[in-house]
């Protein structure tokens, strides 16, 4: 296999012939990300890592999930506050967050799953889970709604503030809910 030289510059190869003769591939330098940029990163666990690295380098990143007040006696949101792993692994779940933000759909009050309690071990054995966000769980429908609203507020604030949107995708199966045609977030 022939060696290819990669060159970052302000000007791309004007012709394919130039690449063939020089074996140099010139890629443009995009200067979209600046120290004062506001970046919204959503998607797979890679988006979590990107948010962490950008924040370490002084970039203002959104959503600011770690700012969500957590009450583990009432609800759980991912692994917050230790890790901001609010992940969305497929395009349907990500699209639904943007649709929710733009008012295209609103989650119904009774749109949740009753699941076996493996979090608090309550006497009734059930807790309530948001089908559209991974590991958002409440002890009651009311505490689940509070958790859903807190995640929505953080997500919406990020969408309003951001200048750059970065979306990452995971590789996962997609589950469409029969009752309303929406897609669950694993």
What are these regions (language model features)?
Residues 1-186:
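Extracellular glycan-modifying ectodomains
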């Amino acid at each position: 296999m022939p060696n290819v030289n990669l060159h970052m510059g302000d000007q791309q190869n004007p012709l394919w012939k130039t690449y063939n003769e020089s074996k140099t591939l010139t890629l443009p330098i995009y200067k979209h990300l600046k120290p004062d940029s506001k970046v919204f990163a959503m998607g797979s666990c890679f988006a979590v890592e990107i948010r962490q690295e950008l924040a370490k380098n002084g970039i203002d990143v959104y959503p600011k999930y770690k700012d969500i007040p957590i009450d583990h006696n009432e609800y759980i949101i991912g692994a917050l506050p230790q890790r901001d792993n609010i992940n969305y692994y497929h395009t349907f779940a990500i699209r639904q967050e943007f649709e929710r933000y733009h008012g295209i759909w609103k989650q119904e009050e009774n749109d949740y799953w009753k699941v076996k309690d493996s979090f608090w071990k309550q006497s009734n054995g059930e807790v309530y889970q948001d089908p559209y966000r991974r590991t958002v769980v409440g002890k009651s429908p009311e505490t689940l709604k509070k958790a859903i609203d807190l995640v929505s507020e953080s997500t919406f604030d990020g969408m309003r503030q951001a200048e750059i949107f970065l979306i990452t995708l995971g590789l996962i199966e997609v589950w469409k809910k029969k009752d309303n045609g929406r897609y669950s977030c694993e």
